[in-house]
Design a protein with these regions (language model features):
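Cell-envelope and extracellular/periplasmic
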Residues: 1-248
């Protein structure tokens, strides 16, 4: 089993070691082979069935690649992978707002961006983590499948990160991957782990999970546990943070 972020169409950060992870038969071994250099890596699965491994990537390229994973019983081949620059976008509605806009809130130039998005089909990929809160850190994010950039998929791409990606791919001439992990109206407390929040006496941790008393977007730590932490294993170049209004 693999998280949705480790899937077909993903973009891997160039010229570094990237982390892959998942679940397999406990106390077994797993082999991973990369198409770009035909190197084989071996991961040991622990007694809880979890494994992770670091794989060396080459310089950025528009040439499509593959990763093959097998454990002697099952075989998974991940297709149409690109090597380039990967950025993680998070925050509240400014980061979440898609190219199609929200109700009565259109994106200036959004329709044109959607209609012409096909020109980035071989250079931009986009993954969106679903909005899920949790009281304890999760192993896998919900959602996160990588989408090719085209007029069918682009309407759901967060606009801020999309325009960042188009600029980046045009200036650097490399593939760009965006992971969008955002929740409109959220406060910064929701994106922080419990051990940090314990340092602040004005934050009431009992509000976490109490949907009857307070909206999930205003609850402490639940977005960190349900969205940010499980996606944080993915190797990226940098982090785009667009949040603040809910804390003013």
């Amino acid at each position: 089993k693999l998280p949705a972020l480790v899937s077909d169409n993903m973009v891997l950060q160039q010229a570094t070691k990237v982390r892959l992870w998942g679940n397999a038969t406990p106390n077994s071994s797993l082999k991973v082979r990369s198409s770009w250099d035909n190197t084989e890596y071996t991961a040991q699965v622990n007694d809880q069935g979890r494994w992770e491994i670091w794989v060396q990537t080459p310089s950025a390229s528009f040439e499509k690649q593959q990763l093959t994973l097998e454990n002697g019983q099952d075989k998974i081949v991940l297709h149409d992978l690109l090597i380039g620059e990967v950025w993680f976008g998070s925050g509240q509605s400014n980061m979440e707002m898609p190219l199609r806009g929200f109700w009565h809130c259109p994106i200036e130039g959004g329709n044109h961006a959607i209609a012409t998005s096909g020109k980035y089909k071989n250079s931009i990929r986009y993954a969106t983590i679903q909005r899920v809160g949790a009281l304890e850190p999760k192993d896998y994010p919900v959602g996160g499948e990588w989408k090719v950039c085209d007029p069918r998929n682009a309407p759901e791409f967060g606009a801020t990160a999309y325009f960042f990606a188009t600029l980046l791919t045009e200036v650097l001439n490399v593939p760009v991957g965006i992971i969008n992990c955002s929740w409109g109206g959220s406060t910064v407390e929701g994106w922080l782990p419990k051990d940090i929040l314990l340092n602040y006496s004005d934050i009431d941790l009992s509000l976490a999970g109490n949907d009857e008393k307070i909206h999930p977007m205003l609850q402490p730590m639940i977005m960190y546990n349900g969205m940010l932490k499980p996606a944080s294993k993915y190797t990226v170049r940098g982090f785009l943070w667009y949040q603040g209004e809910s804390n003013v």
